[in-house]
Amino acid sequence: MDWLDDVKWDAQGLVPVIAQEQGTGDVLMLAWMNREALRQTAALGRAVYFSRSRGKLWFKGEDSGHAQTVHEIRLDCDRDVLLLRVTQQGHQPGIACHTGRHSCFFSRLGDGAWQAVDAVLKDPRAIYG
């Protein structure tokens, strides 16, 4: 039996993936993987996701230079969520979000409204052109 068969894939053949920074424990982002993305991530030691909007593999950092080196891949108790422990590359501190922030989780609910609480580290126009 292939180790990929132990994962509970959804009806579209995908599984959600949380990327967590190895050194700080910061939650960087949530993305999706299909079997090939997970296979390549394990083989290459760098994060490869599946882009639902583009319908293809997405090598994290291929456009931005902000790749993720994968140190550990974990599967949750229900076998339907993955956790990647990563080092975020390309900037210090690492930029995981396409908005130029460290984490995609930069909005906090307060007083009935979402507020951006984390600074933009690099203008996205400078990242993506």
From Swiss-Prot:
Binding-site residues, Zn(2+): C77, C97, C104
Matches recorded under InterPro entries: PRA-CH, PRib_AMP_CycHydrolase_dom, PRib_AMP_CycHydrolase_sf
Any one biological process term the GO annotation gives: L-histidine biosynthetic process
Necessary cofactors: Mg(2+); Zn(2+)
A cellular component annotation (GO) from this entry: cytoplasm
Bound cofactor: record note: Binds 1 Mg(2+) ion per subunit. Binds 1 zinc ion per subunit.
Record-level Gene Ontology MF annotations: magnesium ion binding; phosphoribosyl-AMP cyclohydrolase activity; zinc ion binding
Residues that coordinate or bind Mg(2+): D76, D78, D80
Name the record gives this protein: Phosphoribosyl-AMP cyclohydrolase
Lineage: Bacteria, Pseudomonadati, Pseudomonadota, Betaproteobacteria, Burkholderiales
Gene symbol of the encoding locus: hisI
